Amino acid sequence: WLFGHTMETRLYTLPLNIILYMIASIAGVVLVHIALDNISKFIKEGLMKDRFNFENESFEQCEEKVENEYSVNIPMRYYYKGKFRKGWISVSNCFRGTWVVGTPGSGKTFSIIEPFIRQHSAKGFAMVVYDYKFPTLATKLYYHYKKNEKLGRVPQGCKFNMINFVDVEYSRRVNPIQAKYINNLAAASETAETLLESLQKGKKEGGGGSDQFFQTSAVNFLAACIYFFVNYEREPYDANGKPLYAERQQDPQTKFWKPTGIVRDREGGNIVEPAYWLGKYSDMPHILSFLNESYQTIFEVLETDNEVAPLLGPFQTAFKNKAMEQLEGMIGTLRVYTSRLATKESYWIFHRDGDDFDLKVSDPKNPSYLLIANDPEMESIIGALNALILNRLVTRVNTGQG
């Protein structure tokens, strides 16, 4: 109906009202586009002027410096609305962890790592810095240490220590294989696993259950050796490193003399509490040398410790059955990898008599800066040695012992 008249007119079988509706719809769409085009002429913000962001414009960033006693504040510049502006990257809670990702040469050290070192040193933090390309970070860390020590910002008694397996003349010595760092068999197993995984860095995963069996066997055997040497003929020491006297009694099973738990001062004979215990051969050089002994000698020595005896079951069975191929598969893998660690530098740094500092770097009574140096050309060897130190250090700090 249109003005009271029926619309019976048709055009190619289409009613006239449908045709008028289509014409009106098309005209409406055209008019809307014309209106939007006219509106865009009044917008002066340059809409779609740089649709592919060739100017590298970013979003509006934080321009307020949020600072507290733990924060790290990194200045920055960003481009927004046609001009460069200044802002701040404020890491208010560093204890949550900060993950820095970037390609080589992208400026990670300059933009993130160095501000962390500079500001944490000024705020009196103890630090552990892993210098991947020594001395890139070593010189900066030592500079800020001396600067803030002069200004009185470094905690009193804080020392600067360095571990360097390449230029040992710069290095101090430390012994991570001792009872104060490895106090049970689980800690020995974790240490052994960390060391072997670091030596096998870059090896492709896979190989089935047989490879996993030999890998686990190597870890268990190394853990047994570590724990044996940590506890073999342990002697007590006081906080100053002076030896104390431990009363002993004979074990009826092994016929060995073992401590009773009573410790006395050598001078006055008074009962005292030792600061730590140290095995007679408790260090990495003795363990590496021990692994090169004959199987019979190794088993005869390790069997004297009842705590490590359960780990030796598969090895002793293979040895008694003269399954030398299986035994070589279980222990030979360990010997091949650990033989690469037997260098004069590692023997000197890890020797029992050269424990120059404690890995409790965050101890309020004895804080320190520790720089661990690395050389990319010898990373496969040095990285494993450094991993051994870091494993014991991180475990000690995270358990509240540091």
Where are these regions (language model features)?
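Basic- and hydrophobic-enriched, low-structure N-terminal and domain-boundary segments
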Residues: 1-106, 110-115, 123
